[in-house]
Amino acid sequence: MAISSAICNSFKQEILVGTHNFTASSGNTFKIALFTSSASLGAGTTAYSTSNEISNTSGSAYSAGGATLTSTTPALSGSTAVCDFADVSYTSASFTANGCLIYNDTNGDRAVCAIAFGSDKTVTSGTFTIQFPTADASNAIIRIA
């Protein structure tokens, strides 16, 4: 099992039929769920599942299903459409995560993208932050060129 960073194939088709709305004030609710190294996430992932989702080693910083993302309305960076989210922090956290899945909580928990952290990331009684990259044509977490 492994996590590989990819825009999910199902998402590519679903945006063409209007399944996903990233508009900040009136769009769908998107969430980010964290997973262990035993998870299998990547381009073929179609929906969120609790299988191999992380659990707290102590405390209650992380809840099943993950955190709700705050999005900015999609924009153009040159000729590339980009979408961005506010960084997510889990405070007083104790857990280990190897990657995550962004998914549409409004529309059937459909997968948007999987992100591999490159290795296990562990936090013990601290703050675990997911920092999203700059929302431009080269770096945005979701880009359509």
Enumerate the predicted regions with their spans.
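Small cysteine-rich, disulfide-bonded extracellular modules of the LU/uPAR three-finger superfamily
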Residues: M1-N98, D105-A145
